[in-house]
Amino acid sequence: MEACNCFEPQWPADDLLMKYQYISDFFIAVAYFSIPLELIYFVKKSAVFPYKWVLVQFGAFIVLCGATHLINLWTFNLHTRTVEIVMTTAKLMTAAVSCVTALMLVHIIPDLLSVKTRELFLKNKAAELDREMGLIRTQEETGRHVRMLTHEIRSTLDRHTILKTTLVELGRTLGLEECALWMPTRTGLELQLSHTLRQQNPVGYTVPIHLPVLNQVFSSNRAIKISPNSPIARLRPLAGKYVPGEVVAVRVPLLHLSNFQINDWPELSTKRYAMMVLMLPSDSARQWHVHELELVEVVADQVAVALSHAAILEESMRARDLLMEQNVALDMARREAETAIRARNDFLAVMNHEMRTPMHAIIALSSLLQETDLTSEQRLMVETILKSSNLLATLINDVLDLSRLEDGSLQLDIATFNLHAVFRQVFNLIKPIASVKKLFITLNVSPDLPEYVIGDEKRLVQIMLNVVGNAVKFSKEGIISVTAFVAKSESVRDPRAPDFFPVSSDNQFYMRVQVKDSGSGINPQDMPKLFTKFAQSQPVATKNSGGSGLGLAISKRFVNLMDGHIWIDSEGPSKGCTVTFVVKLGIPEGSNEPKLPLMPKVSANNSQTDFPGLKVLLMDENGISRMVTKGLLMHLGCDVTSVSSSEECLRMVSQDHKVVFMDVRVPGLDGHELAVRIHEKFMKRHERPLIVALTSNADKVTKENCLRVGMEGVILKPVSVDKMRNVLSKLLEHRILFEA
């Protein structure tokens, strides 16, 4: 035990001092341990502190210092070597951390000294941001005022209201003493005071347009400060006021006003401007700010746009009023034209009936007289009467057809017919006339043409008769050739009509007919008027040629209705001409058989016993027409009973009558109603006579009405003996006849 050195010798200690050191070290340790906690809290909460790692070093230093003081509590009494080692280690660590922290502070202190400089920099930045925010707020305020002013300006399209609203809103927004608008005069040489803020009816002051201040303002799109003593700034008297307010002026473009004939604005051929003048309150230190000038400039542009819109509105309203007036006038003209067309149609209908009735008598009696024994001189006179009457009847038909073509009421009568028979019919009609003039006429119908086609047989015959008839009429000698074939696309082109390009299909084709003669020919300058109604070329319109000038005009319209084209070629006078027309025809479905019977051949028998004992009832209100028709029927051997009214016809008709001829235009009970009554009287078909309308109306409506009431046929006056003979033959053979 004596050799044991477990306890090192210690200094004797004062108990009171020891107690105070104990307490002091304890509280020092508590303080050292609490400060790192506070630093940790600061590091977590501070997002912008740049030296967090320095705070960590401070924390470690303080913790080690606290640990040193805490360990030191055990060194006041006797303690072991272990406590001494721990104490020494703690002090070494504290010394190391303290030195590192001290070295780091050498580098940090300059940065900490620059914090003040940064603070000043940040303050300057903050002040600059405040100024920018103030500018932004000013711009927003200006924008709000602009939007408000724009809304007020555009709330109306009346230009006087626009200008007055602009001045009022600018005066209220900017606190103006006066605001005025100068407009150019009609001559454009002066500006006139048109609107002011304070004066209800401003006197029309004017200033010359060539003033330097005006040129200065007009040459810039910005608001310009001008002298309060300028002529355009003297808006109000300055009595009792010492310092006039600042004045600015800005131009207002008059956009596109040259396109609008505003009554009280000048007609501006070049770009001109109005001028807006704004005055701040007098006797005040207020000045114009930049944002206020920008506001004025924007408002001036908005006023220009609003005035342009107002001008457009005024022009559109004027155009609308003018259009309404024109529509009223056009509607009145249309009604007058419709009235005139109806009057013309009524006149033509009446004249058609009134002319055909005597023509019927002339042609019928002439044809009857022609079949009697006459001397050669008498026969020549009768033939002349008959030819002249037929020519007059043709002229009547042409006039009526042209009238219906022009008002669009004429429509094609589409049916299946024998195309080859049509060519033979035309050839047989024209050949005798050509023989008299010693003309040789040839007909060449291509085998590729279908025998039966779908189209308007009557109009096709009329076209061919007009074209071939003209060739015969205007040729004194030579040959006339008629050629017909299926048209190919390359053979129907006419350089004068490049838009006409026909295309055939499986059930339709185009037929080309070419009529070439060696007649008088045509002057090239007369070509354009050949298809004009009542017009003929000079070499053609000879005194012996005859004709009304309607044939080609009507033929052209018929060809157009058939989706075709017609043209004429001639090398000049005395060199003949070639007329070519192309029409579209349909191909019947199924077998190539006729859907309608062919025209029966004309009987060569001119005896009076063609229809011996055939009982016929004739009803015609016109006495002459009734007598003439009765004579025709009796000449053909018919047993005729004639009556003058529908009531008498209804009373006289019986089963013994085989045919009833009736005029459909009679007073009281007309022909259509009479046909219905006859159908009601004879319910059985074999007991009912055949009903045929004998009419002067050649329109399609008459035919449709007759079909509707059950008539078996329609015959157009005038009627000759041969025509009546053919009519009865076809009627009795087929029990139906509707003359084309």
From Swiss-Prot:
Induction: Not induced by ethylene.
Alphabetical list of CDD domains matching this protein: HisKA, REC_ETR-like
EC top class named in words: transferase
Catalytic activity, as annotated: ATP + protein L-histidine = ADP + protein N-phospho-L-histidine
Gene from which the chain derives: ETR1
Gene Ontology terms: cellular component: endoplasmic reticulum membrane
Protein name: Ethylene receptor 1
PANTHER family xrefs: ETHYLENE RECEPTOR 1, TWO-COMPONENT SENSOR HISTIDINE KINASE
Record's cofactor remark: Binds 1 copper ion per dimer.
Domain GAF: 158-307
Entry keyword set: ATP-binding, Copper, Disulfide bond, Endoplasmic reticulum, Ethylene signaling pathway, Kinase, Membrane, Metal-binding, Nucleotide-binding, Phosphoprotein, Receptor, Transferase, Transmembrane, Transmembrane helix, Two-component regulatory system
Coarse class of the protein's main subcellular location: endoplasmic reticulum
Residues covered by the Histidine kinase domain: 350-587
Bilayer topology annotation: Multi-pass membrane protein
Cell location: Endoplasmic reticulum membrane
Source organism of the structure: Pelargonium hortorum (Common geranium)
Modification type 4-aspartylphosphate: residues: D663
Binding positions for Cu cation per the UniProt entry: C65, H69
Family membership noted in the UniProt record: Belongs to the ethylene receptor family.
